[in-house]
Each structure stands twice: as C-alpha cells, then as structure tokens.
C-alpha cells in the first residue's frame, strides 16, 4: 500500500518537471584566458585541418577499442606471502597465583596482565600491608610494568565496609 502512494507522489506532474529540467540553461564552458585565445586562433589559422581532425572519429581506432577486453587479477604481493609464512611468536604466559576461585576457569594469563581476582588481591594486600606489598614487589610478583603498577595503586581502591553505630538508643539491633 505504501509503495502505491509513493509511486503516485513520485509520478505526479512528471511531464512538467521533466520539461522544466530540459529547458533549464545548461552550464557553459569556463572562459579561456585571453592569452590562450590568441594562441589558439593563431594555431588554427596556421593549421586549419587540425580542427577537422579533432572533431572526426577514427573508425580504425574505435574498432581497436571495441576489440579490447581487459581481464585483470591483482598479483599476490611478496609481503602478503611472507606474512602468511611467518607465524606469530608464542606469547609468554604464567599460571594464576591463587586457585581458591575455581568457578573461574583461567588456565593461563599473558605476562604483563592480571586477572580481576589477582587485581583485587594485590590491591587489598597493598592496602592492609603497604610496607610489605610495595609497587616493586607487586611488579616482580605479577610480572607487570612499573608504570602500570603505579597507576593501579594510584587510581584503583578496594571497597571498604564501615558499620556506623546507631545514634538512637531505640534502634533495633541486629541479632
């Protein structure tokens, strides 16, 4: 139903719109520079047969053009072949530190990365024992870069649960 309406709107007044487009002034050629005009007039006056040659179609060349068939395929570049032959270097992996979260099956961790459990563990250790768990020790223990460890300790903190004593004596105490 929608296509019928759209077609009707599209074809409405089609002949008048086409006539209007046809009768519009066509864009004219950009004017030539005055020095170029004089040179062109001079060349045409010296060689009048050139003007006819430019306008004439050469049947021999047109027949050659019709016979041309181009079928091209890009050659496989040597860089692509070499890239396909070389295998990626194997990454270095390490085993996770703690296995007390067995529901997360992590077999190996790339060097320079840590799991979420390890991140929370090292943040908590650093918070509880900052003298023992320094950035250098964390860097060596988890095989991380110094700037990453410093950023981790600076911008990430673990949650703290604080229980405030009730101000009101009539508050219900938890059992």
Curated annotation (Swiss-Prot):
Classification of source organism: Eukaryota, Metazoa, Chordata, Craniata, Vertebrata
Main localization category: mitochondrion
Record protein name field: NADH dehydrogenase [ubiquinone] 1 alpha subcomplex assembly factor 4
Modified residue annotations for Phosphoserine: 35
Connected disease: Mitochondrial complex I deficiency, nuclear type 15: A form of mitochondrial complex I deficiency, the most common biochemical signature of mitochondrial disorders, a group of highly heterogeneous conditions characterized by defective oxidative phosphorylation, which collectively affects 1 in 5-10000 live births. Clinical disorders have variable severity, ranging from lethal neonatal disease to adult-onset neurodegenerative disorders.
Similarity-based family: Belongs to the NDUFAF4 family.
Subcellular location: Mitochondrion; Membrane
Role played: Involved in the assembly of mitochondrial NADH:ubiquinone oxidoreductase complex (complex I). May be involved in cell proliferation and survival of hormone-dependent tumor cells. May be a regulator of breast tumor cell invasion.
Entry PTM: Phosphorylated on serine. Prolactin stimulate serine phosphorylation.
Species annotation: Homo sapiens
PANTHER family linked: NADH DEHYDROGENASE [UBIQUINONE] 1 ALPHA SUBCOMPLEX ASSEMBLY FACTOR 4, UPF0240 PROTEIN
Known outcome of mutating residue 73 to A: Reduces interaction with calmodulin. Does not promote MMP-9 secretion
